[in-house]
Every structure is written in C-alpha cells, then in structure tokens.
C-alpha cells in the first residue's frame, strides 16, 4: 500500500484554503449522462445541497469527432479564470480509462494545489492497478 495516502478532517482541509467561512469553489468532474439513476441523484445531491459553489463538468467525449478534436476541454479554472478550491472526481469518471480523463487533464490534476477528492463506488474495480 502506498505511503502517500493521507486522511484529513474536512474542517482541516477547508481551513487550509484560507477562505474561512466563505464558500469554496468546487469543480465536480462527473458524467451526468451515466445510465444508473442513483448516479445522477448523487451528482445532483452534491450540486444542489452543498453550501459551496459547485460546478459540474464532464470531460468524456460524446462522439468520435469530439474525441479526435480533444473535446470537451475541461479546465481547472472557473468562468472568471480563477482556480477552483476543490476538485472532486466522481465515480462515473473512471480515472483508469484514458478517454475519461485525457492527458491534458491528468497533467492539470497532478499540478493542482487545491483539495482533491476522489469518490469511489466500486472498491473492487481493478484493485491491482
């Protein structure tokens, strides 16, 4: 098991942003078109019930042309060009599939200095990778 895994209390993570009681800007990478209804409910619940500003983006191409043209291009900055405070990767975005998380986004996620959270649903999926 990797020694790079850390567990923090949510309050500790939030205090590290320096925003105090201000809402955080959160990017939720998720596939809202996922076929399971519970998945869409989960994504909606995060977006609609959070006290923070949550933006949902789907980095998965929807067509062969999108894939060839590198669309959609999801950045880690909001509409005003500011870095998000938090990036959440929902389980509908399988990070082990290159088409789901393109190279440019992997590079951006590695360099991202904010809070990164990955929500895993199936803990038995490819446990050897």
Give the positions of each predicted feature.
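N-terminal acidic, proline/glycine-rich, low-complexity intrinsically disordered segments
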Residues: 1-7
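Compositionally biased regions
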Residues: 3, 16-17
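Extended catalytic core of nucleotide-activated donor transferases of GT-like folds
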Residues: 8-9, 14, 27-129
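A short, charged/proline- and glycine-enriched loop
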Residues: 17-26
